[in-house]
Amino acid sequence: GDTVKFGMPMAASMTLLAWGANEYREGYERSGQLDEAMDAIKWGTDYLLKAHVTKGGKTEAFYGQVGLGDVDHAYFGRVEDMQVERPAFKIDAQNPGTDLAAEASAALASAAILFRRSNPGYANKLLTNAKQLYTFADRYRDRYSNSITDAAKFYKSWDGYEDELAWAETWLYKATGQKKYLTKAEANYDGVGWTQSWGDKNFGTSILLAQARPNRKKYQRDAEQWLNNWADGAGGVQYTPGGFAWMSEWGSARMAATASFLAGVYSDTVQDPQGKYAEFAESQIDYLLGDNPNQFSYMVGFGDKYAKQPHHRNATGTPDFNTPANNRHILFGALVGGPTAPNDNAYRDVRSDYVANEVALDYNAGFTGALARMYDKFGGEALSDAQLTMLPGISVPESSL
């Protein structure tokens, strides 16, 4: 339940959020959520722009963390009442962070595509900063957690930085159309990794390259190897009797949701002749929303039976996270960690079990795109402003009612 500003998962979340809005813009529009999505993304990209220090048109530094993980974790209360040390940490030429700078570049480039239509001036600003960050990332190379050592305890760069370089290059190609970025992306692309996450971008890149290079089957093979693992229950993925694709104790719902988003994108934009990847994508989102043996929704505030104790300090409303009472505030829309083992009953709605109940930016990033796809494909009825206002803790300005 911390409030440390960890730059790596934050930037990775913005990239995925923007990708979802780019791919399924109509789904966001039809559900009445495009403005909200763009506001959320701009909140994140505005922060990344502020964290980016330039001089003479070049990156001088990028602030990749604010706060100390252990100190922040020791406090569980309202953020407005925090009285703890919150130092800022940066990467620069002497203390590089290739993966962090490249991920920030990818986020800004992905968002630039999204804002191009409605706010071209802002899109240009995003793209200029994305190019500067990429040049810096490519020139000064090292894992960011070697420079920002406090981050190594929580978001360590385990698999190097080549995947982030290829990821950024592919997004820059999509944002600019300049072949030089595509050429570099193909050179840096390293093939199959673990799974798409804040720290591993191989599979997202394989799908982007499969879109860009339809005649080069390697990217399709790599993407489908990963997607088949998820759809078939192989390569570390295990299925519960109720149909949940489980991969890891930490954030199992997040991993399945992100895989679902990418499976949907691949099915819709590359190929899926048997409908296998679309079926996987939809089945996992259905499971997370309550179509499971326990009829339990892992999305807070959705359905009749949902997670009531997400591990989130402000939502809890008390400094004692061991209190048995449900959270004082409903954290609408948050996706909790999910089952901690490949078992439909391996989840406890207990705040102190932070492995199962933690919430995070990257937990919702791919999930949101997957939901937009579902709305785009199957439709639905969005809540009216009047209905939203009736929800506890939700307020809609009168001018919009």
List PLM regions with ranges.
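Helix-capping and short linker residues that terminate individual alpha-solenoid repeat units
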Residues: R25, V53, R116, D138, ...
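Short coil/linker segments at helix-helix boundaries
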Residues: W19-W43, V84-D92, S110-L127
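Proline-centered turn/helix-capping motifs that create local helix->coil transitions or kinks
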Residues: H52-G64, R141-N146, G177, S297
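Aromatic (Trp/Tyr) and acidic
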Residues: G1-E23, Q65-E103, A107, A111, ...
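Acidic, Ser/Thr-rich low-complexity linear motifs
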Residues: N146-S157, Q196, Y239-E249, G301
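N-terminal carbohydrate-binding/catalytic regions of secreted carbohydrate-active enzymes
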Residues: G1-A11, R117, A123-L127, K131, ...
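Carboxylate/His-rich catalytic cores and anion/metal-binding grooves
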Residues: A40-G57
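Solenoid-like repeat scaffolds
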Residues: Y189-Q196
